[in-house]
Amino acid sequence: EGTFVMKGRIQTDKDNNWAIHASTFEHDGQRYMIWCGWQKRRIDSETQCIYIATMKNPWTLSSDRILISKPEYEWECQWVNPDGSKTAYPIHVNEAPQYFESKNKDKACIFYSASGSWTPYYCVGLLTADAKANLLNPASWKKSPVPVLQQDPENNVYGPGGISFTPSPDGKEW
């Protein structure tokens, strides 16, 4: 409703580091933004991490960005294709975070894409926190040590890293 007003880019840190795939959610009466971005300017490699911050309104963060996930497992750090083709420098990826509440609402969940999207190893990881935990505390988040979706060559599944949750018309299924 009403007239759209372009408010501009949301500044995610004082150095104006690169940030993409932002999404917002409300949890326990507080609006949050999650996104992926760089820890610092790229020099000879790149690491995309997942950040979270609280929001003052839909276009302004009200807290510093907090790193809650960075690529650490081998399955999150694949950037070379099976044929040897690769990017010019290593790129380790946690990106495209999507928030989801567990069915009984006792867990806050963030699904994210991991590894290079240009590889068949692109997959989906999962972070979970207790629903009553401080979501800005990195220690609240537990990372699954294995991907929740990954390639399965026997069934011709390659690179299932894109994440989207769509409810059924009656809202009972996702």
Regions found by a protein language model. Give the residues of each.
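Carbohydrate-active catalytic/glycan-binding domains of CAZyme proteins
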Residues: E1-W174
